[in-house]
A protein has these predicted regions:
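Long, non-membrane, amphipathic alpha-helices that form coiled-coils
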Residues: 82, 158-161, 165, 169, ...
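Charged, solvent-exposed structural "stalk/scaffold" segments
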Residues: 99, 150, 188-237, 339-385
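Short, solvent-exposed, mixed-charge loop/turn linkers that connect secondary-structure elements
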Residues: 239-282, 293
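Coiled-coil heptad-register positions
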Residues: 100, 107, 114, 121, ...
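Sec-dependent N-terminal signal peptides of Gram-positive bacterial secreted proteins and lipoproteins
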Residues: 2-32
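Short flexible linkers and secondary-structure junctions
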Residues: 3, 10, 31-178
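Extended amphipathic alpha-helical heptad-repeat regions
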Residues: 283, 292, 324, 371-372
Length: 385
């Protein structure tokens, strides 16, 4: 995997765009075609596997044959990579593990006690109804109809339950992807904050020098000092936020809360894949893969009440409409992200030229340290945009 620091464009825009285009594990499959560490060390690709694997291999829920030996080794090492998130969630996320265990225990058992109770009540009504009494018979038919609707509404087979569990798991994968992007962005934000602090420190020192020359007041110096102190507070706040994201990633992916996995960079965005995306061509597959559509279509086969059949059909159509709208929204989000990346590239090109010029001028004494820090801060901001 290429190091993000070798990129010739904005880190933040690239990370976001990569996450958007690779988020195929979201509840809607969008395109079918196709502990304290703000400063993360950049290991070689041939990293050494930790002696104490994390996540805990004793927590594996799938059988050994579920993955190849190399795949298991990758999941059990102390390295967190974006491409492993789906499998890490599947194996080690507490919610997914609980759902898988529950599904395994309940599969084949009677999952519909409420449904059975309704059916028993229906049988009792028919058994007690007097067929010779028209009023009693009509009342019984009405009561049975109500109970039948309630029974249908409460019926859920194992396949329907699994669809819901799969949807939950896909949502957790998407959440993990967003957290990993957020964590990477926090590194860039930390560099921006530190660069701004360096500039403020230079401004403070320049103000102090001007005061010594009688060109600035004590109030000016104190104001400049307060700016530095406020920036230190902002850095501490950003660090706490990054630590919280780090802990969330650890907990949802099988590490201990104080785990220290080596978190690799989010992969670079695949611009060729973006160029080949076609929401019209992918619409049918995206709708078919939508979890709500799957659920209501499966439910349709279990309904007997015509009212609920019609209602469920409306829910199917609504889910399809929302899936289609979501696909187009995601596609537009990708295009917006690509445009942001292109803008970041151009801004960084300008900032790079300005920095090279400022560096040369600084070397021969044509600009002050404060002027150089201003240009450097602009470059770092452009690089991390």
């Amino acid at each position: 995997m290429k190091n993000l620091r070798n990129r010739k464009y904005g880190y933040r825009a690239a990370a976001v765009l990569a996450a958007i285009t690779m988020a195929g594990t979201m509840p809607l499959t969008s395109f079918a075609a196709s502990g304290k560490r703000p400063n993360v060390s950049k290991p070689d690709d041939a990293h050494t596997i930790a002696e104490l694997p994390a996540p805990d291999i004793n927590k594996d829920i799938s059988p050994e044959f579920a993955y190849s030996e190399d795949k298991w080794a990758s999941l059990r090492d102390n390295v967190l990579e974006f491409g492993e998130l789906k499998d890490l969630v599947h194996e080690y996320n507490p919610t997914v593990r609980s759902n898988r265990s529950t599904y395994k225990d309940q599969k084949g058992k009677d999952l519909n006690a409420a449904y059975d109770d309704y059916m028993d009540d229906i049988d009792a009504i028919w058994n007690n109804a007097d067929s010779d009494d028209d009023v009693a018979w009509a009342t019984a038919r009405f009561q049975v109809g109500v109970l039948q609707q309630q029974a249908d509404n409460n019926y859920q087979d194992a396949d329907m339950e699994k669809i819901q569990y799969d949807q939950t798991e896909a949502g957790l994968v998407y959440q993990a992807q967003q957290l990993m992007v957020t964590y990477e962005q926090s590194r860039y934000n930390m560099e921006n904050l530190q660069s701004a602090r360096n500039l403020m420190q230079a401004q403070y020192e320049a103000t102090a020098a001007r005061q010594a020359a009688g060109m600035a007041t004590q109030a000016d110096v104190l104001s400049a000092l307060k700016s530095v102190q406020d920036q230190d507070t902002a850095i501490l706040t950003a660090q706490k936020s990054a630590d919280n994201v780090h802990r969330s990633l650890c907990l949802m992916l099988g590490w201990a809360v104080d785990g220290q996995p080596e978190i690799r960079d989010v992969p670079e965005p695949d611009l060729n894949r973006i160029a080949s995306m076609n929401p019209d061509a992918d619409m049918e597959t995206a709708i078919a893969n939508n979890y709500d559509v799957k659920y209501f279509e499966k439910k349709a086969g279990n309904l007997t009440s015509q009212y609920l059949i019609d209602s469920n059909q409306a829910q199917i159509q609504d889910a399809k409409d929302k899936a289609a709208k979501s696909l187009r929204n995601q596609y537009n989000t990708v295009l917006t992200g690509r445009d942001s990346l292109n803008a970041a590239v151009m801004a960084l090109d300008v900032a790079s030229v300005n920095l090279n010029t400022a560096t040369a001028k600084r070397a021969v004494g044509e600009i002050t340290e404060l002027e150089y820090q201003n240009v450097l801060n602009s470059y770092i901001s452009a690089k991390n945009s």
